[in-house]
């Protein structure tokens, strides 16, 4: 990506992830926690405090060349509103990099099959995660909101004691990785409806 681009970090926390890019790009960020926003500003991020479910992102349509949304989508009750707003402030042809905790993991399937427990990082009782995703459902979400899926990369497998041995394979088997990085391109504008319901049949 050429220098001088406008990039938004949705759910930026303390800004550590995109701070290295602030030397060559204009990085903006939003987060709900005032203390984290203050730290993000110190890291060179143009950060503001904002509740993602409390109203529109505080930016005009088509402002950003790229958007990063890391480990945030699972914390939102209204997934469609989040994706609509990301689409709105992203330029046509702009890139979205989205990461999420994948519930379709070897350990997660074992927890459900043998212990009658939800997978790690799932929307469990008293969890801060409100929505569960797999790579397939994320692709459905992206398509529903005007994005073209480009590629997915798995970050690691969670397999105690043998994680270091198996984790390199996650790059090539993202649908089994416990964290997935997805890259997508905005093709069309999104339409939001508070009554929209994702189908629960076999997609």
Residue ranges and their predicted role:
Residues 4, 64-65:
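Local beta-strand N-terminus motif with an aromatic residue
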Residues 16, 32, 39, 77-85, ...:
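S-adenosyl-L-methionine-dependent methyltransferase catalytic module, highlighting the catalytic core
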Residues 6, 26-28, 148:
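Residues at the starts of beta-strands that form the adenosine-phosphate
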Residues 14-55:
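Class I SAM-dependent methyltransferase SAM/SAH-binding core
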Residues 56-61:
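Short conserved loop adjoining the S-adenosyl-L-methionine
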